[in-house]
From Swiss-Prot:
InterPro entries: Papain-like_cys_pep_sf, Peptidase_C19, Peptidase_C19_UCH, USP_CS, USP_dom, Znf_RING/FYVE/PHD, Znf_UBP. This is Ubiquitin carboxyl-terminal hydrolase 1. The gene is UBP1. Residues 474-485 have a biased composition (Polar residues). The keyword Metal-binding applies. Residues 202-1083 form the USP domain. Zn(2+) 3 binds at C95, C98, H119, H125. Residues 387-424, 450-486 are annotated as: Disordered. The keyword Metal-binding applies. It holds the Pfam family zf-UBP. GO terms for molecular function: cysteine-type deubiquitinase activity; zinc ion binding. One of its GO terms (biological process) is proteolysis. A zinc finger (UBP-type) spans 30-165.
Amino acid sequence: MRFAATVSEKQSEQSVEVTEEFAVTMTEKRSCVHFDKYVDLDKLLKIIKSYQQIKCGECNERVHVKRGSRWGASNRRDWYSSSDQNCARNAIWLCLECGYYVCGDVGLPTEAQSHVMGHNRLTRHRLVIQCKNPQLRWCFSCQSLLPFDNEENGEKKDLLLEVVKLIRERSPNTYSASFETEFSCSGSIYGGIEARDGYAVRGLVNLGNTCFFNSVMQNLLSLDQLREHFLKEDLSVSGPLVSSLKELFAESNSEASVFRNEINPRDLFFSVCSQAPQFRGYQQHDSHELLRCLLDGLSIEESSLRKKLGVSDSNDSSTYQKPTLIDSVFGGEISSTVSCLECGHFSKVYEPFMDLSLPVPSMKLPPKKQQILSQAKEVLKNGAVSKDSEVVSAKPASDHNSTVPLFPSDHKIQSRPETSDNETDLVLLSDVSDTAPSTEAKGVNQILVGSTETLMHDNDRTGKTVPDKEDVRATQSNEETSASGISAVIDEAQVCGCPDLEQSSSSANQGADEELALMVADSQVLYMPYKDHLFYDDYMVAEASSSFVSGDHEPKKDYFDFSSFLDEPEIREGPVFRPLSKSEVYEAGFKADCSDDKTVSAGKGEASSSFISSDHEQNIDYVDFSSFFDEPEISERPFFRPLSKSEVSEAGFKADCSDDKTVSAGKGEASSSFVSSDHEQNIDYVDFSSFFDEPEISERPFFRPLSKSEVSEAGFMAVSGNDKTVRAGKGETFSSFMSGDNERNIDYVEFTNRIFDDRGTSERPVFGPPSKAKVSEAGFVAVSSDSDPAVLDESDSPVSVDRCLAQFTKHEILSEDNAWHCENCSKNLKLQRLREKRRTKEGLSNRWVNENGASSAFDECRDSSLNQSCIDLENGYKAAPPITKLPNCKEEESAIDDGFVGEENTKQAPITSVTETPLLGGETISSQPASDNECENWEDLAVDSEEVIVKRDARKKVLINKAPPVLTIHLKRFSQDARGRVSKLSGHVDFQEFIDLSKYMDTRCSEEDEPVYRLAGLVEHLGAMSRGHYVSYIRGGHKERRDSDTKEPNSSIWYHASDSQVRPASLEEVLRSEAYILFYERI
């Protein structure tokens, strides 16, 4: 811990080894007045001679000091105790005023916790000299180096020459050997500054979110080839980028940055921004993009300068040009070979590269299992809620202050004592009372136990209470009945867009009948809340609905067969549905508040359907929807017709009617009447065959059947209010079930099979909204996220740079849309067509030869229009246009027989010159062309001019043909999806200090030197996309030492640079980092 604190203090100090020439330059500018005043050379020489060895006096007195000594141990323990263990790592300094040896920094003695600083604080002695490097002579008061010599009689003489000789005689090996070893391994903060040609690691000032720029520049400044070029070459005539980069290299050199902790790269950054304006401002950018823009700018600038100066390294007839500096340092070449799998023809292309961008193997995280679905599955499997269990009690809905919190504020599930022992978050209600007498006189026979309306927008969540049975009876005199539903507890961390969850209460909504769908499975009631104005994507336009009609005498329990919710795909037959009162009827989101003698007009060309609620007798109409997608036949069974699309709103239509009031319909439309009477019934039959012009699109709402895989992926949570409708997906049907005394059941199995046969979905439907919450504003909340984070794919082996290179250079099969245009196969197809053409031409000419052995050119010209048909008859195939893909271009004859090839409208060649042949009667006719070769060549050219493209499956392989001096490897950690969202692939990718590219090189490569590289630096990105930071690791030290220690794995000195902060780092720390860009130098 003490050593870590010492290292951290060094980050803000200026300690460095200075060469003799530069120290002279610095001391000429600064003269110290304290040397002549406080240094007594004779006294100092005597003290130095009295010491036999050079050791730190404080470290030695740690063992032998007495309490009554000159400064007292108690006064020194606050500063020397933390540095005793590191004395062997530090240099020894001699106080020029008292001759006392103390240990301190390797560079300048400015570390606060060092013994030399403690000696200065206690004694106020100002002047010290370093024993290992006597050129370092420091004055604490002036904060500068002392002059080496003084001019006397026109000659320069070193005033401390005798002192330096005595110091070198005092057993210098006693400390220098151990110091060299410890210093090389410890990685002091300025250990890289060892000689005039060594690289001095300095921090770079952050100009405002420019860490992406600083991290790249730290690595470029550490590259030996670039530094030698910019420091030694004469670049007086250059562009702004080259000039500013040269100045930055000069400032970072150890000879020019002794007294500077950091460098301001303002000029270079502004030069880059002038050519790449996207880096302006104070926003974060990609460091790899900055690197490419900088290197391209330097290369373009150098090429432009060559053209202006007229520099040419080649003749006019040669296209060779001397590569630029960037091309010679970073430029490499890859070979891309594509070979046809059919004929073996291959093509090789050489492409230059500045860096290798390697894709990192990754995989998507599996979606989190949602708590509500897993618990519901357990309930349905184990039957946790018994048949005789009571309904969960709640306060009346009329009490506005009472709430049943859907999401408790303490993030814990509220206990419900009415449920069974195997209690879950999903509350299942059972045993709804068969009879619920009503005080309302207009046929309302049963009140729904209740449903919770929870409308969830991004930050808005409300909940409605569940009314008790007797409290509901007490409130039935009102025109409206409050509705409530299930309370589903979902992990708040998985709910998207709802960071704050509040409890609220709601009461009955005046002027609207509120009712929710009720589903029952084996005496277990599951309330499924829904709402009507829910819109999904454009492809989800078909809708369906569920309507219920109730009678008075023996109301049935309505339920959906929900046994296959998450279990085996069993579908029960003969569902019974809960009867609803007249005021509670909803058809496709349609809401009719009607009393006796109310009439609602129907859509265009449609019939009507009437509902009758009686105290003595009831006849229930229902819809046979088994043939929904069959031929448009007229249904023989009466059902209730929803209005046309023009009469409904987006979620369904809502017709509010009063007594003796009729809503006019469209042209040619019938009406639907609702009559409430004690003795009479009137049933209308509806022709539903022409309701939809396109039967695959339906706009009637329903709970869309979802497969188990869809539910497990994102799940559903339908939280909506009364009179709300859920839209379904495209091509989906709806269900319209009714129940009453004279109940006629629909074949549920047939109905669901038709749905899934037409949609091609799973056989295990789960009724609910779609799995993705694409309309969270409508009330649906998805538990899973669309952008799941990606992780490194370590299923086969740990991810490493070698594995990425192997993935980059492995064979790739090009097929289907990516099939390769094989020139050899295209040429063979042309030749095949030419041969076939000549073969048919020869057969045709032999057929028309006359008896004298001379062919009749006249007959040939006369019958030229029939040649094509004759060819077709002889060869047995019709002429076809050029085929782009053949199964085998080698087997020519089989291709012809199979009809894969043909020729286009072959025309007879024009007769350019003819010979006069005397015939009977002295007449002459044109004979064969004088030049048959000319005619044939014309036809051959016509065939050759046809553009024939044959695409074949091919194999592609990419290898490195030329290895660059500096290999830059870019790991693709950032990706962008189709929606433009950028994500980061976090995780450690294994890499080594040395890398060999031999197995990734092209076998025809003629390079003699082995492509072995050593790590020179890297760029690492920390954090996430929104709040990230770039840092860099740089290999420092003397160039000659680095070159001589290439075979030693731990001989490097590494530094960690984060903008202006620079600290030493070990090689183990470097290899543990999550590298983004790697820089390797060839050895």
